[in-house]
Amino acid sequence: MFAVIKTGGKQYNVSADDTITVMALPGEKGDAVSFDTVLMFGGEGQSTLGAPFIEGASVVGEIVEQKRGPKVISFKKRRRQNSKRKRGHRQDLTLVRITSLGAGGASPAAAAASSETPAASAPEA
């Protein structure tokens, strides 16, 4: 089983027991986090796409670590002006281990079966 979730303006393809690094999330080590913005859910040859999200689906994870990314240097120089500026930035990151994927009541097979439209009946006179 896999799911595509959206968090921090990015999309992540996850499955159970995956470890992902996302933008900083509130919480301490060991806290549970839930991602409700599931874009796609699937597995075993079947998948469900959201429009834009799948209703009731969620992915649950556990915070492994709060850390900071590598230092990125921003250097600007104006030639012949004896002017320069050097700044550094480190992004706050959260390491999350995915513990479970929930389809939200409907499995991909059930969702595909329910999306089929019944044949139109003859109008009554």
From Swiss-Prot:
Keyword Membrane tagged: no
Low complexity biased stretches: 106-125
Residue ranges of the region described as Disordered: 75-94, 103-125
GO cellular component: cytoplasm; ribonucleoprotein complex; ribosome
Pfam families the UniProt entry points to: Ribosomal_L21p
Compositional bias per record (Basic residues), positions renumbered to this chain: 75-89
One GO term of the biological process aspect: translation
Keywords, sorted A to Z: Ribonucleoprotein, Ribosomal protein, RNA-binding, rRNA-binding
Record field: transmembrane: none
MF annotations from Gene Ontology: rRNA binding; structural constituent of ribosome
Domain of life of the source: Bacteria
Keyword Coiled coil set for record: no
Role played: This protein binds to 23S rRNA in the presence of protein L20.
PANTHER family, A to Z: 50S RIBOSOMAL PROTEIN L21 (PTHR21349), LARGE RIBOSOMAL SUBUNIT PROTEIN BL21M (PTHR21349:SF0)
Similarity comment text for this entry: Belongs to the bacterial ribosomal protein bL21 family.
Assembly behavior: Part of the 50S ribosomal subunit. Contacts protein L20.
Protein's name in the database: Large ribosomal subunit protein bL21
Organism (species): Methylocella silvestris (strain DSM 15510 / CIP 108128 / LMG 27833 / NCIMB 13906 / BL2)
Gene: rplU
